[in-house]
Amino acid sequence: MPQNLLDFDLAGLTAWFGERGEKPFRARQVFHWIHQAGVTDFAQMTDIAKSLREKLQNEAVVQAPAINFAHLSADGTRKWLFDVGVGNGIETVFIPEDDRGTLCVSSQVGCALECTFCSTGRQGFNRNLTVAEIVGQLWVAQHSLKREPNRTASDHGAGEIAERPVTNVVMMGMGEPLANFENVVTALGVMLDDHAYGLSRRRVTVSTSGLVPAMDRLAERCPVALAVSLHAPNDALRDQIVPINRKYPLAELMAACRRYLVHAPRDFITFEYVMLAGVNDQPEHARQLIALTRDVPCKFNLIPFNPFPDSGYEKPRAEAMRVFREILQDAGYVVTTRKTRGDDIDAACGQLAGRVADRSGRVMKRVHREAA
């Protein structure tokens, strides 16, 4: 079976070439052709010896996930559904803004963590994505957007073709990135490599629900910006809505955040907080957050819940959001309220579901629970 070269970072590709008697600079050339030029046909890699091109055609492929469909939101947000085989699909979202282009990347087919307010978690879990499937989302987005006129949220008309449409990557799509640790770290290495996409560590963010041991490993192996899906200010509530908290409670999570900051490219952790009407959006919850995070340099990203069918939750009132935000701001915190982008194409936070052939049994267990 041919080797998919998208599965390699530069070190891995160099080793693979070495096993075939090829010099390291040849690996760098091919790496550049694949990631910077967007070329998948070895015959078009014209500065490479014909004999090597023929060898690659026999032994390798460059294969990103196939696009099943693409949607364009009224606000300029784009969503792709990628086919990753055996009835499974993953979703990837591109959010254009005047000063950046952010790609929201998936790391798993489904998610095993069962956060109760997340559409992905409702779909069950099938498998981890390969490196090629993770990097392939960026590869497709970068090179397909390069061929299109640059569009922003404020100007949907034609413009100059962007040299680098994707300036930021957030691992906030389907799945828990740190539960697919090795593949995610390898993919991050490709994203950061100057021979590939050359993204800054400050512009690549991994989001986790709180897998504490993996947070420590990420700090050692590939410290990028870190976002923690917090969503509750106390263990009793977080145990209910973010079940991984039962394994790694808040005291352990806050300690892991402090350790991560020793290595992080930014001097703060971003705490993501999906606000659920009547559940975690009251003033006392904001005050509990202040007490919880007083020893962790951080900012808060408040996210109004994005409804999906049968979620059981409602979007918070604007007044509740305002009061909550002001309590945090008055305590000296930087607080942002995430704009809802792409909700008309189900591309907003918490709405990504794709297609998941559940192998975990979680969907049927949930159906039986809800029917009881």
Swiss-Prot record:
GO terms for biological process: rRNA base methylation; tRNA methylation. One of its GO terms (cellular component) is cytoplasm. Its cofactor is [4Fe-4S] cluster. Its main location: cytoplasm. It catalyses: adenosine(2503) in 23S rRNA + 2 reduced [2Fe-2S]-[ferredoxin] + 2 S-adenosyl-L-methionine = 2-methyladenosine(2503) in 23S rRNA + 5'-deoxyadenosine + L-methionine + 2 oxidized [2Fe-2S]-[ferredoxin] + S-adenosyl-L-homocysteine; adenosine(37) in tRNA + 2 reduced [2Fe-2S]-[ferredoxin] + 2 S-adenosyl-L-methionine = 2-methyladenosine(37) in tRNA + 5'-deoxyadenosine + L-methionine + 2 oxidized [2Fe-2S]-[ferredoxin] + S-adenosyl-L-homocysteine. InterPro entries: Aldolase_TIM, Methyltransferase_A, RlmN_N, RNA_MTrfase_RlmN, rRNA_lsu_MTrfase_RlmN/Cfr, rSAM. Signal peptide: none annotated. Residues 97-344 form the Radical SAM core domain. Its EC number is 2.1.1.192. Binds 1 [4Fe-4S] cluster. The cluster is coordinated with 3 cysteines and an exchangeable S-adenosyl-L-methionine. The active site is at E91 (proton acceptor), C349 (s-methylcysteine intermediate). PROSITE patterns: RADICAL_SAM. PANTHER family: 23S RRNA METHYLTRANSFERASE (PTHR30544), RADICAL SAM CORE DOMAIN-CONTAINING PROTEIN (PTHR30544:SF5). Belongs to the radical SAM superfamily. RlmN family. This is Dual-specificity RNA methyltransferase RlmN.
